[in-house]
């Protein structure tokens, strides 16, 4: 138990507005974790690590199994997590919501029920269905809620598969450990390697294979024609490069000032790395080719850091990250697809947006603010995607780096068209 009476009884945090949630004094983060776990009926396995299992806000990683156990131990009650049926026990008066509660006994309750039954049933149902915080879509039925949960689960599995492959390929994690339990990012508790521009060859064939599996697993991808599916796949590669690096950097801890790339390498960002354009920078390199390669890669990396900083401040949950990544793919690709492809893209994007709103509803007390902040992240992510695409084209076209042939094929279509992305939201 925490020594500070105002701190969270789960993680001992005293800086996150601790107050009573679900029957115990907890911070907002632990309350959101408990609400999401109960609402989505999630099960966890203990990772059996002393620092993580002690469940403390100072720990870099917190075991979710032990965190949930501690929530139960301090008296947090799953029954207090409001289900959809319980939310319907609120009625709208003017612009606010009040609880339908009888303080005089069953007679008043029965009278109120009779009055409600006299109302138009369609208006009553509509009122209850729209009582939730305004968003892209209120949840009008249990079917919509089930669809949202199915969408979340689908993309969690897709990202988990990619995470496992990167752990095997780049972190050299034994397969027995990979199969033991899933991770939210591939390099958790794994040593990172310093980035070496001399050894960098861009994305490898292994990367293209795992991204292909991810793309094919996206609902709607197999419904597109050949040209649309090729463009969508190429865009997934760019989105994965940008947003996964931002998420891995956030999970590593932005306070370390290290940019983590998808291949498990990192670049210290303090002091700010050189770009190769400084005065007399050529004296630091053995050859002109090394200087050109450095000048090509480092501005790309510095631009990526500009995405990582606000993304870490957003502090997305794993579910928000997975859904935002897919939303970005469909939103950007929409403007370059055929008419049939656009219909698929808009349907899938809207489905993902509804699922994201559902996740924000489970995680945050202020759903509208949280949902808006997550969606606004698309702006700076898409700006970086445009920069990455331009850099990939230049690298492949001029042969500055000895990249894989798949990389040349990946960027060939951008050589013939404008590299600008979709307008921001």
Swiss-Prot record:
Keywords from the UniProt entry? DNA-binding, Metal-binding, Nucleus, Receptor, Transcription, Transcription regulation, Zinc, Zinc-finger
| TM spans (from-to) | none
Q: Which residues bind DNA?
A: 5-83
**Localization terms from the record:** Nucleus
Any GO MF annotation of the entry? DNA-binding transcription factor activity
Zinc finger motifs (NR C4-type), residue ranges? 11-30, 46-71
Of which family is this protein a member?
A: Belongs to the nuclear hormone receptor family.
UniProt name for this protein: Nuclear hormone receptor family member nhr-13
- Organism, scientific name: Caenorhabditis elegans
